[in-house]
Amino acid sequence: MEASWLETRWARPLHLALVFCLALVLMQAMKLYLRRQRLLRDLSPFPGPPAHWLLGHQKFLQEDNMETLDEIVKKHPCAFPCWVGPFQAFFYIYDPDYAKIFLSRTDPKMQYLHQLLTPCIGRGLLNLDGPRWFQHRCLLTPAFHQDILKPCVDTMAHSVKVMLDKWEKMWTTQETTIEVFEHINLMTLDIIMKCAFGQETNCQINGTYESYVKATFELGEIISSRLYNFWHHHDIIFKLSPKGHCFQELGKVIHQYTEKIIQDRKKILKNQVKQDDTQTSQIFLDIVLSAQAEDERAFSDADLRAEVNTFMWAGHDASAASISWLLYCLALNPEHQDRCRTEIRSILGDGSSITWEQLDEMSYTTMCIKETLRLIPPVPSISRELSKPLTLPDGHSLPAGMTVVLSIWGLHHNPAVWNDPKVFDPLRFTKENSDQRHPCAFLPFSSGPRNCIGQQFAMLELKVAIALILLHFQVAPDLTRPPAFSSHTVLRPKHGIYLHLKKLLEC
């Protein structure tokens, strides 16, 4: 009798708890079902490649298969819906008219992607929106003014020459094969440390920042993998996974380096004996530190760390990829390489000194740089979350809340926009051809109010690097080890870029 009473006493609460849990599961299932039906309705006017009912297009998204994207662009020349699992979809666009409308708006960045970035870099220009973004942008823009960048030419040239000295020591025969991306990555890090942070690290020689470079690469891989893995969208599942644990450890590495840079610069400024009190330093970090000193509430310690993280990461990674791909393209196309070298010699001589004005004269080399950025854009896509409905040129509309991805790769490889898009043809960028082209056909640095703040710095770095490299070496591809793409936040070479280097003895 007593057992029966106890069973009755506990059975009802357990029954109610079970019913409550079941109701929650059913409510969540209904919510997801309605979300999927809404997405299917909104995206029904837009054809696209078939998607797996559960995985969506994850196979295509996770394989770094740019050829598959090229095939999709051929079949669907403006846009297509891309499913990430059964309940999440992005809308990919790669048509200049679509891009023009998309970039003219002020929609916020894709929130989920930038939530993934925040633990690594904080909330800086890359992932801020609204008034806070505008405040940071206005504050940092002066650091990239032409008058501030001109003195950087000598600094960049010095860092490139350090790398070339290493290559010359490695060069022992008529032709030496070198994996160039690793060296170029350290060189661009050296440049950003000097030009933006006022730090003489000698990182190309002493290897002090190798763990930082490795951490940025691995973080990029994890972020990209998580973005397109439906199961890892849930924070708890991700944090309990091996990748989640690795992500947290790598984030600590990034923050340690950032904190050291900030503290070292503060000490330098504190101990600096000013010869001219009216002279103000205009390097990036000093501008940020000055802003914080004026109003710490408007620009906090977190803001400071976020901007240093953002520019340290973005400032060297994309540049390293661009220079490496430029070298590879010129190695594959020796006739263009020779023409660039001839132009560079006629302007720079032996390259012992380089000026801003001389770099501006390198018209054919600049066209080769732009063609490389078209063929292999360093940032393959950008994304926004629509704050209000978007009406496309064909009259169809997308609702607020939809995530739109502008595929810069797709745009630059769209045969409806570019003739023979796979062919390396620098003459696409003559003044006549550029004037006849849609203004949004070529977007390596994006466009509109949120374009890349450092694009002038990046172009300067590309010109200095390629000029000095071609003056000292002839490059040819190692056809036994062709590079593969690693499409994360930056389009890197997955296993490096191997080139045959032949020293030009007249230099």
Curated annotation (Swiss-Prot):
Record EC number: 1.14.14.-
The reaction(s) this protein catalyses: N-(5Z,8Z,11Z,14Z-eicosatetraenoyl)-ethanolamine + reduced [NADPH--hemoprotein reductase] + O2 = N-(14,15-epoxy-5Z,8Z,11Z-eicosatrienoyl)-ethanolamine + oxidized [NADPH--hemoprotein reductase] + H2O + H(+)
Any single Pfam family the record assigns to this protein: p450
Entries under InterPro entries matching the protein: Cyt_P450, Cyt_P450_CS, Cyt_P450_E_grp-I, Cyt_P450_sf, Cytochrome_P450_Monoox
Subcellular location: Endoplasmic reticulum membrane; Microsome membrane
Tissues where the protein occurs: Expressed in brain and aorta. In the brain, expressed in the Purkinje cells of the cerebellum, pyramidal neurons in the dentate gyrus of the hippocampus, cortical forebrain neurons and those of brain stem nuclei (at protein level). In addition to neurons, also expressed in cerebral vascular endothelial cells (at protein level). Also expressed in epithelial cells of the choroid plexus (at protein level). Hardly detectable in heart, lung, kidney and spleen.
Primary location class: endoplasmic reticulum
Residues that coordinate or bind heme: C452
CDD domains found in the cross-reference section: CYP4B-like (cd20678)
Cofactor requirements of the protein: heme
GO biological process: lipid metabolic process
TM regions (residue ranges): 14-34
Molecular function GO terms recorded: anandamide 14,15 epoxidase activity; heme binding; iron ion binding
Keyword Transmembrane helix: yes
One CC-aspect GO term: endoplasmic reticulum membrane
Claim: Kinase is one of the keywords in the record: no
Membrane topology: Single-pass membrane protein
Keywords per UniProt: Endoplasmic reticulum, Heme, Iron, Lipid metabolism, Membrane, Metal-binding, Microsome, Monooxygenase, Oxidoreductase, Transmembrane, Transmembrane helix
Family: Belongs to the cytochrome P450 family.
Function text: A cytochrome P450 monooxygenase that selectively catalyzes the epoxidation of the last double bond of the arachidonoyl moiety of anandamide, potentially modulating endocannabinoid signaling. Has no hydroxylase activity toward various fatty acids, steroids and prostaglandins. Mechanistically, uses molecular oxygen inserting one oxygen atom into a substrate, and reducing the second into a water molecule, with two electrons provided by NADPH via cytochrome P450 reductase (CPR; NADPH-ferrihemoprotein reductase).
Protein name: Cytochrome P450 4X1
Record organism: Mus musculus (Mouse)
Phylogenetic placement of the source organism: Eukaryota, Metazoa, Chordata, Craniata, Vertebrata
